[in-house]
């Protein structure tokens, strides 16, 4: 498996959990979007967040001897992109502890932007490397390629740019937890 080679560890689809799944934005094949629908694709398609889906399966992870919940694997295989591309916003300088991750993920995006710009939070060393003027990094996706990261990286699906009526964004998404020396992937 290519993922195993890339990661350097065995990768197993965990049959007891949902298999990696699809994010599909845009119209069905042969259908076009109107201006309002195109406008929606040009807006943030998801919240600013860290991936904590593994928390829904805490009882599942208990069956393994060695489990590392601090280093969650997240991956996206790009299948189809809008005409003008697509990608992922990344706030790689936001190094949150577990309590901050738990709080941050359940806030409204407006509150998250305030958190990301909260000078007091960063000045008290709760997060390293903060620059309040810095925009998030943009990781551009390419059709047929996979992007992955390990850890609680703050990120968001980047909205489409100059959306066209037949644009679609289709990706295969998944997550993984290292259990007994193998990545167990799920959705």
Regions from the language model: what does each represent?
Residues 137, 154-163:
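Short beta-strand His + acidic residue motifs that chelate non-heme Fe in jelly-roll/DSBH
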């Amino acid at each position: 498996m290519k993922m195993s080679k890339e990661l350097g560890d065995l990768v197993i689809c965990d049959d007891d959990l949902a298999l990696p799944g699809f994010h599909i934005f845009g119209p069905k094949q042969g259908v076009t979007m109107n201006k309002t629908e195109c406008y929606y694709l040009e807006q943030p398609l998801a919240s600013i967040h860290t991936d904590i889906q593994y928390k829904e399966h805490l009882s599942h992870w208990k069956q393994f001897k060695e489990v590392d919940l601090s280093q969650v694997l997240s991956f996206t295989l790009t299948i189809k992109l809008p005409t003008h591309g697509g990608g992922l916003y990344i706030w790689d300088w936001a190094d949150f502890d577990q309590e901050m991750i738990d709080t941050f993920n359940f806030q409204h995006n407006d509150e998250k932007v305030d958190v990301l710009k909260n000078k007091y939070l960063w000045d008290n060393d709760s997060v390293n490397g903060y620059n309040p003027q810095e925009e998030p990094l943009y990781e551009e996706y390419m059709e047929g390629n996979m992007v992955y990261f390990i850890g609680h990286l703050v990120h968001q699906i980047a909205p489409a740019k100059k959306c066209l009526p037949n644009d679609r964004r289709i990706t295969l998404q998944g997550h993984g937890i290292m259990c007994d020396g193998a990545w167990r992937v799920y959705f």
